[in-house]
Amino acid sequence: MYHLKSLARQGARRQQELATLAKALPTAVMQSSRGYATEHQIPDRLKDVPTAKDPRFFDMVEYFFHRGCQIAEESLVDDMKGKLTRDEKKQKVKGILMLMQPCDHIIEIAFPLRRDAGNYEMITGYRAQHSTHKTPTKGGIRFSLDVSRDEVKALSALMTFKCACVDVPFGGAKAGLKINPKEYSEHELEKITRRFTLELAKKGFIGPGVDVPAPDMGTGEREMSWIADTYAKTIGHLDINAHACVTGKPINQGGIHGRVSATGRGVFHGLENFINEANYMSQIGTTPGWGGKTFIVQGFGNVGLHTTRYLTRAGATCIGVIEHDGTLYNPEGIDPKLLEDYKNEHGTIVGYQNAKPYEGENLMFEKCDIFIPAAVEKVITSENANRIQAKIIAEAANGPTTPAADKILIDRNILVIPDLYINAGGVTVSFFEWLKNLNHVSYGRLTFKYERESNYHLLASVQQSIERIINDESVQESLERRFGRVGGRIPVTPSESFQKRISGASEKDIVHSGLDYTMERSARAIMKTAMKYNLGLDLRTAAYVNSIEKIFTTYRDAGLAF
């Protein structure tokens, strides 16, 4: 909750006001935020987060939220409509911002599992719904021994701001089961997943219009298919939209083409929007474009793999891969397809012959243009941020940078592209899959034939127009003088690129186009906000400001029921 205080502004000069308030409220964080004054106070319980070595994950998200509020609050007050005094507007804005902070619902579930060997154990899981300002809520389910109540709350909060950042109309949620999936058989994992689904359903924590899970760490299409099947055959057996209760499903279960690679492709598009901006590249001392760029990726799972593939295709060079059981380094480049094949065959990247194990202290400190943390949270801290040599950090993982490290990186002119934007490709394409399930038809099915015939009619029309013109007598004489040819047919053939698209966009084409557009539009909005508030390279605060303004508008326009 917020610790709100009423602050009277006395005196004629603004700088004197700020100085007085700063002395009176040393922990209130009354700051100018690069020239933009605010009264918003960061709660005392978060006062150590900006310098903490290992803050709680949820505290990190809360702190970034409050930092965004410091920038946005004054503008939100100015934009308030209605016959209210300024003090009344301030109180309303503070009230709505207060409403946006806490986690709305969180459930802890424990149930027994009878293992294949006959012994029993208890399984613990969580589901958090951070914000229901938009429904359904949306967020993945992860299977990991690191799952905790704090982590699930933090990830659900991050999902709220992530969805708002890229204009996906969902609230934020997250779930986790505290298990290591590698220690269970497929039969045991199916029993765990189906039982967890039933427990969520009984408590109203899953449903097409209520709460829609998705894959996350340790889960994939298989688990999502089990969830959809369990829900459809129990609680949702009369619901025609039952399979929209979860996304990331196999294609024949209502999944969508392009979902598996969506997060990695989103990371690529997000990077592309900033790496081609000469203004940002000049600030960090590099040139625009992919040519000659090197990168290191931490984590070679689904996100890391597809990110590496798309960046390599664009012309960048992967020189290092960090995994939990080993690292690879090759300054000449690592082929992501060959490494993927090796990992699929051996279950690890260790032993891959086309790169050497890194012999230094930590590969993430190696010189490169782009560092991509795509594994777990809090890998860049105040203790190692000064050793990062990359010029760009793309947060493909959730929460990889602590607030203290974030400040160090910005002060060092390192461009941090924040998690709530850069890894939003997954939830964006999940939104497309959810819409597909509600519409009960795949994208493009109704238009494929029409688009193909329309394109051929267009080519025929161009050909007829040209032939009609050249058959004119005056044109014939001119053509005969210049080319020695009169009349005849002039075939109009499609170019190679047009020929590939002439039959109309496939579902994957539509998904890729929609994702590209979403990431581009969101990037422009972040840049615009960063410029508006003079935030420089602080893209994280700009992204949070955008999210806060959108969520605030939803609450403001909907009103409070009670």
From Swiss-Prot:
The active site is at K174. SMART domains: ELFV_dehydrog. Its EC number is 1.4.1.3. The keyword Repeat does not apply. One of its GO terms (cellular component) is cytosol. Keywords: ATP-binding, GTP-binding, Mitochondrion, NAD, Nucleotide-binding, Oxidoreductase, Transit peptide. It holds the Pfam family ELFV_dehydrog_N. Its main location: mitochondrion. Residues 1-53 form a transit peptide. GO terms for biological process: glutamate catabolic process; glutamate metabolic process. It is found in: Mitochondrion matrix. ADP can occupy the NADH binding site and activate the enzyme. This is Glutamate dehydrogenase, mitochondrial. It comes from Drosophila melanogaster (Fruit fly). The lineage of its organism: Eukaryota, Metazoa, Ecdysozoa, Arthropoda, Hexapoda.
